Design a protein with these regions (language model features):
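ABC ATPase C-loop
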Residues: 148-149
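The feature captures the beta-strand-to-loop junction immediately N-terminal to the Walker
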Residues: 34-36
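Conserved ABC ATPase signature
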Residues: 131-135, 139
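Conserved ABC transporter NBD signature motif
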Residues: 57-65, 77, 110-114
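Helix-to-loop junction immediately C-terminal to a conserved catalytic motif
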Residues: 49
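ABC-type ATPase nucleotide-binding domains, specifically the catalytic core motifs of the NBD
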Residues: 13, 69, 94-112, 120-125, ...
């Protein structure tokens, strides 16, 4: 399965944010999307998931144009989204939050989804009856990812999963995403920790002012002097 964009342009009101963006992610690969605040990364993810309409260009699921499809319809196709800020229901338990991610599953697959989430994040199993609002920041991020995985997505969009986390927890979350990829899921990762992102990703795109300015193998970009100077302070 391939999720791609061709010549994508969009924005808010009269303010254009994305300018002719081309990008793709396939099942079984982790692709990092890098850039400073305001580069357009979150806007791109919101457009991919159907929360924002493109002005021009196309969002493609294989060769199918997703124009006009709602976020719910895209989720049914297999497109998952872990938004920035987690957006959990704090007065619901871990298990209840996870169950919300299974809304589009065929009957009988919910338990399979729980098993998958709890295997990936054993800490969630230990706290399954605990209110989400009482979890630590790292545990809440694990829950947000687990909820998205309950729908068995083919492609998963993940926005700033390590935001506000201690370095050890940030690494734990990104390594968990790498295990998700090993199961065959494609992940498009927006992440502030550029060095760690490039270590776990196979490919990467770099955005500036709403445009893709660099792309390629993550290992090569990690050694690119422009990336090292702009994002790694080297």
């Amino acid at each position: 399965m391939r999720l791609g964009v061709e010549g994508l342009e969009t924005g808010y009101g009269k303010a254009q944010v994305l300018f002719g963006v081309d990008l793709e992610v396939r099942e079984g690969e982790l692709v990092a999307l890098l850039g400073t605040n305001g580069a357009g990364k979150t806007t791109l993810l919101r457009t991919l998931s159907g929360l924002l309409r493109p002005w021009r260009g196309r969002v493609l699921w294989e060769e199918r144009d997703l124009s006009g499809l709602s976020p719910a319809q895209r989720a049914r196709l297999g497109l998952g989204h872990v938004p920035e800020g987690r957006q959990l229901f704090p007065l619901m338990t871990v298990e209840e939050n996870l169950r919300l991610g299974a809304a589009f599953l065929a009957p009988g697959r919910e338990e399979e989804g729980f098993a998958r989430a709890y295997t990936l994040f054993p800490r969630l199993a230990e706290r399954r009856r605990q209110l989400a609002g009482t979890l630590s920041g790292g545990e809440q991020q694990m829950l947000a990812i687990g909820r998205a995985l309950m729908g068995f997505p083919k492609i998963l969009l993940v926005d700033e999963p390590s935001l506000g986390l201690a370095p050890r927890l940030a690494e734990e979350v990104l390594l968990a995403l790498k295990r998700v990829v090993e199961e065959g899921v494609g992940v498009l990762l927006v992440e502030q920790n550029v060095a760690l992102s490039l270590e776990v990703a196979g490919r990467a795109y770099v955005m500036e002012h709403g445009r893709v300015v660099l792309q390629g193998q993550a290992a090569r970009l990690l050694e690119d002097p422009r990336v090292r100077e702009a994002y790694l302070s080297l």
